[in-house]
């Protein structure tokens, strides 16, 4: 698993990383941190948490950061209610606005809180969310974020087929 997730991370960097880009150092630092965390991970959950943090932070660096605080339509803050996640729009939509949009992917507020924490906290900081996360939560988040990442490139992420095998 460690090798395949490392391969996945490398592939994302080769797709979105641009040589001589002002954010190259930030991307390199993130790459180093995620590989270090994957190498020292004691469980699949630890590997996946490192990769989820990478997915969220990498998309933020390259300008495709996700919105988890407010509805992308009405801009109202979404607190402890369920919401919908729009891959096309890059974030959450409240139930009221979704009546018009028809986004199918319902997102529980605890899942949103988990991803928000993964995106906001320092890479090496272990939050309560890291400790409470289950393999299933990590798997759902990884797949959701991978789908979002895939929607921003016309290149196929090849390593994902091995991870899903």
Feature-to-residue mapping (PLM):
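Non-catalytic alpha-helical scaffolds and adjoining flexible linkers that form interface surfaces
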Residues: 1-165
């Amino acid at each position: 698993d460690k090798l395949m997730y490392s391969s996945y991370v490398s592939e994302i960097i080769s797709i979105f990383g641009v040589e001589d880009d002002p954010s190259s150092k930030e991307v390199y630092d993130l790459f180093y941190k995620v590989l270090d965390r994957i190498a020292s991970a004691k469980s699949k959950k630890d590997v996946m948490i490192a990769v989820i943090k990478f997915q969220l932070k990498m998309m933020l660096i390259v300008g495709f950061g996700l919105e988890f605080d407010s509805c992308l339509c009405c801009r109202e803050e979404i607190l402890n209610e369920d919401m919908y996640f729009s891959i096309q729009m890059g974030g959450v939509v409240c139930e009221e606005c979704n009546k018009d949009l028809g986004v199918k992917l319902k997102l529980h507020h605890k899942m949103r809180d988990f991803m928000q924490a993964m995106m906001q906290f320092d890479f090496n900081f272990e939050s309560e969310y890291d400790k409470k996360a289950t393999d299933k939560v990590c798997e759902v988040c990884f797949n959701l974020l991978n789908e979002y990442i895939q929607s921003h490139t016309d290149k196929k992420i090849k390593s994902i087929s091995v991870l899903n095998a």
